[in-house]
Amino acid sequence: MRLRKLLIFIPAAVILLFFLLTDLLSDLFWYASVGYSPVFLTILITSAALFVIGTLLFFAFSYGNVILAARTGAGAFGVEKEIQYLGGIACAVAAGITGLSLSSSWEIILAFLDQTPFHISDPVFGLDISFYIFSLPFYTILIQYLLALFVFTLIISSVMYAAHRAGVRIDEYGVFQYIPGPFPFGLSWKDTVGRFLPQVNCLLFLIFTTLAAFLWLTRYSTLYTSKGTVIGAGYTDVTITIPALTILTVIAFLIGLLFLLNEKIKRSEMIAYGIGGFFIIAILSAGAGFLVQTLIVEPNEFNLERTYLGYNINSTLDGYNLANINARDFPVLYNLTETDIRNNNATISNIRLWDWRPMKTTLEQLQLFRTYYTFNDVDVDRYWLDGNYKQVHISAREMNSYNLPQQAQTWVNRHLVFTHGYGAVMSPVDRITTNGLPEFFVKDIPPSSPFPSLSLDHPQIYYGEGDIPYCITNTRTEEFDYPSGDENIYSLYDGNAGVELSLLPRLVYAIQLGSVELLVSGSLTPDSKLHLYRNILERTSKIAPFLTYDSDPYVVMSDGKLSWIIDAYTTSDRYPYSEPVRTGELSAKSMNYVRNSVKVIVDAYTGDIRYYIVDPDDPVIQTYAKMFPGLFRPVDDIPDDLRSHLRYPHGLFNIQAEIYGIYHMTDPRVFYNREDAWVIPDEIYRKTQQRFEPYYVIMKLPGEEREEFILMLPFTPRNKQNLIGWMAVRCDPDRYGEMIVYQFSKQELTYGPMQIEARIDQDTDISQSITLWSQAGSSVVRGNTLIIPVEQSLLYVEPLYLEATQKGTLPQLQRVIVSYGDKLTMQPTLNEALQVIFGGRQARQDITKRVEQPGDDQSSSILGQISGLYKQAQQALSSGSLGEYQQFVDRIGTLVSGY
């Protein structure tokens, strides 16, 4: 009979087990399809081993004590099995929870086992930094596990003993009963408690010994915590807190020994004295620390904290890889000539006139062609084209099947037909048409380009930045490839990517994805391929979750295909004496150590992922490489053309610049007083004041012979608007990652971005032009202020865009403002502005320079005509009539130039 009952439950158990294994099987299939099964298996086996070991050890120890406590409490009366079973269930649940928690620490365990030394010692304990990064987290996890085990065991054992001692029973109906009266067989409370005390003493010994270990480790954590002026252990920590923790460690261990030896020495009062002394010293040390900090340190803070401030400065520079910055003086000379401008043509011709935000809006109007396409981002890169080094904007045209009409939102369309984006758009950052629109190096569908090196053999984009649902290829349904006039072109995927949908994978993914269509669709064949995790950030973090990924991947055209490059970082929040930062640009977590050690390259067509180590000196990435052999490749394995497109990450540079603005003050006294603090300045974008953003430029650094691709950012003194310096990092392969800081003279005024913005606002002609354009129904967008070093001078360039206030706007580059020294001009093009400043040419008469005072009949008439033509132009644009739109724009131009 019992066997029949068991047989009834076997199918249900099998089904339940299959559902539990679905996630595991789906991951196994996917990792095998991308070629990273060893990574997955390493994580899986380590997690499973930790879970099993942690659970079994916890259960065996706690349940063993439960059995012992039950027998002790029951005496000769006998153990109540049901009560003991309840204790076993409690132990099993606690063991499972603890084991599950321990299994999530697989990265800490593996890093501890494979750790790489930094060969740098902390200044207080003299330990290698690797102890804090790799060993201390492991010891902390171990202590937390043991403390949870021993405390839980003490509690559950005490409950088990008390339940048996009190005569609690469970009847045949599962109801608790209490048997009152004296304990049977003549045993008193004192007798049974005496039998239970040895077990309690042993557990308390283990608890206090573990507590002693915890207090000992806490001493090390003072080196990366923040209190007061110093990041890390300061004077009070070194003289009071750390010695006090050492004393408390010894006392806690001695208390544990007293518990262990209590049966022999029979001196319970000594335990009481020990525990009392422990709390007294803990309270006194906290009070002493407060008094020392308040009465001794704060009145003489710099002298007492000077040494520790030095530790803080040096460690922070090390933590953010800023210790080897090359600082140079940059005396600003306003002696540029027209010849200098011509000699720096590569710099001038790559000044970014198009900001990525209006560029994105313009691309959406001119190059999407269909509502289901999208440009998720506009990236900045550089290419060698016909012997010229050109900075460009590039954006991938991705598929967004969520934008299909509602009636077309079918499973077949979203997962079998509209599977991929198509091509990319590339535009030089400096060129505009006569209509104020960008020129294109690559455009349209299919992509066309005058440069053979930019041709694409596989323009299809199956993997990108967007929220991309899974798709299935190699089906009986053709995939939409691209629109061609009134027709659509269809294709079939010819790559090897994806999970083969044989019977078992179809069943597994149907359950995981909640898609019955995977089982019943007649379009699928055994050769069909399922493409999962098509968002490239999700895809890369699925394989290597221990890295931190930059939120701004960028697309590259190389070797006839599209590839994505993603910056990946190793981070830690345990670098001694390094100041922590919390930023959403890299990670929501706090960190005080970061290295851009890895570049990830993802093929947009196949989804193939490669991880390349670009900073082999980073001990953290060396540790990960040992944890996962075969995952990482050396940087030299990157194809040369792709390697030429590596760039220094914008987000990391922003963090480093912010840190360097404070920590360039390496003199502890200057640092303490913040006498020379630098900040990242503000600028005006549109009509809003915002923080200045780092920007990529192609330029010739002072003293260098050729132009190169760099990322740069200016600094201003805190609470001032003038420039104090600028920071640059090289991006070209031969000198990648080299940082230089150029410092301006503190005795001479060098205009900062907000001072240039103020000069623009105060210029009557420019202000009148902006007012006029705004009155004509347009919105004036003030672009980023770019500070361009040329020779030993600075050029300031700010583009102005016009866009309609209606929906479907098409931003146009209307004017370029250039400032040099005391000169300021606004002209239709950059070249004209430079000719006005350096060539002695008379400035073109802007429309506002001819505007009469309010009430002038001629002004009112022309303004009315311009306003009317502008409204008609916007109506034509909204209806998609670009030809009519251009005619109206030309008529406006005629009125402006003739007035």
Curated annotation (Swiss-Prot):
Record bears the keyword Magnesium: no
GO CC annotations, alphabetized: extracellular region; plasma membrane
InterPro entries tied to this protein: UPF0182
Transmembrane intervals: 6-26, 39-59, 93-113, 136-156, 196-216, 240-260, 271-291
Subcellular location: Cell membrane
PANTHER family in the cross-refs: UPF0182 PROTEIN SLL1060
Protein's recorded name: UPF0182 protein Mhun_1303
Species of origin: Methanospirillum hungatei JF-1 (strain ATCC 27890 / DSM 864 / NBRC 100397 / JF-1)
